[in-house]
């Protein structure tokens, strides 16, 4: 049997896909695993803000098309890049054990965000990060930055920005933790939905593949990601919606989740604890609660 894995060709995407390939080889040594690099619209249009050209779905569109056409058997995605609703006929039955869900601050000049001078320039194209940075430091000038991780690190190192904010998990996966100056607490920078998690997507009727990749699934990571994605779906959030959610187990079956939703003028937060069997329902309830609270500011 041969399994073809569809993935983007970036350094980070290949690192994530190799992790899946190695796991499949470990569990199923008799199977041949092939990596198929697919260039996505998000990779091609890497100088334009995502919100201006179609959002996060641009990072998975061509890969999902390859899946549906049978050109690949499964796809590997950063869960935070998966939009609220993806192609009919596909399923994500597996989430690997989650890496760090936190954001980090990188700078060639400053040790942390607190030490940045007045009106310092921070690079990030994430509206989620922008609203939280401006809530923390209204003086900061937050400007867009696109490109792969190495490109963004280089821009920080040559002084194009006073600092940038990136996901810690990506830096861990490409062995670039040396550039981290500060790991940002979720109290000041709440994570993107699914941040730090790798999801495996396949065709909903491909039961042979589904049964195989389920052995790679981390139950707790999957449940937390589904709770966060229920929040995302309820809001129908996209890459230009300032929202955040982080669900984490506090014991064997109890989860704590914090969520944020914002508009141009206001930001609202909420948190709750729930049993894992209520994960998706709790995500829906949190979404409704924050939408209702935010609507009261208009």
UniProtKB/Swiss-Prot annotation:
Pathway it works in: Porphyrin-containing compound metabolism; protoporphyrin-IX biosynthesis; coproporphyrinogen-III from 5-aminolevulinate: step 2/4
Protein name (database record): Porphobilinogen deaminase
Record's miscellaneous remark: The porphobilinogen subunits are added to the dipyrromethane group.
Entry EC number(s): 2.5.1.61
Family: Belongs to the HMBS family.
TM segment ranges: none
HAMAP family xref list: Porphobil_deam
């Amino acid at each position: 049997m041969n399994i073809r894995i569809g993935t983007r060709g970036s350094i980070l995407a290949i690192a994530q896909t190799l992790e899946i390939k190695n796991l499949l080889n470990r569990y199923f040594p008799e199977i041949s695993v092939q990596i198929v690099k697919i260039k996505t619209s998000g990779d091609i249009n890497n100088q334009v803000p995502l919100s201006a050209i179609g959002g996060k779905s641009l990072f998975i569109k061509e890969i999902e098309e390859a899946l549906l056409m049978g050109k690949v058997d499964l796809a590997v995605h950063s869960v935070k890049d998966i939009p609220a609703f993806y192609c009919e006929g596909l399923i994500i039955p597996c989430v690997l054990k989650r890496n760090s869900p936190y954001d980090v601050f990188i700078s060639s000049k400053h040790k942390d965000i607190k030490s940045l001078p007045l009106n310092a320039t921070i690079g990030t194209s994430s509206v989620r990060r922008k609203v939280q940075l401006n809530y923390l430091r209204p003086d900061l000038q937050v400007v867009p930055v696109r490109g792969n991780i190495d490109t963004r690190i280089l821009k920080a190192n040559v002084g194009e920005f006073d600092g940038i904010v990136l996901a810690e998990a990506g830096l861990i996966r490409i062995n670039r933790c040396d550039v981290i100056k500060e790991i940002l607490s979720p109290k000041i920078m709440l994570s993107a939905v699914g941040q730090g998690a790798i999801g495996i997507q396949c065709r909903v009727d491909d039961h042979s593949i589904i049964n195989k990749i389920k052995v790679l699934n981390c139950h707790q990571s999957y449940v937390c990601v589904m709770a966060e994605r229920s929040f995302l779906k309820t809001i129908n959030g996209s890459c230009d919606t300032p929202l955040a959610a982080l669900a984490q187990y506090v014991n064997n079956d109890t989860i704590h989740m914090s969520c944020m939703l914002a508009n141009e003028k206001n930001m609202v937060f909420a948190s709750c604890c729930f049993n894992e069997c209520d994960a998706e329902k709790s995500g829906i309830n949190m979404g409704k609660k924050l939408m209702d609270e935010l609507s009261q500011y208009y």
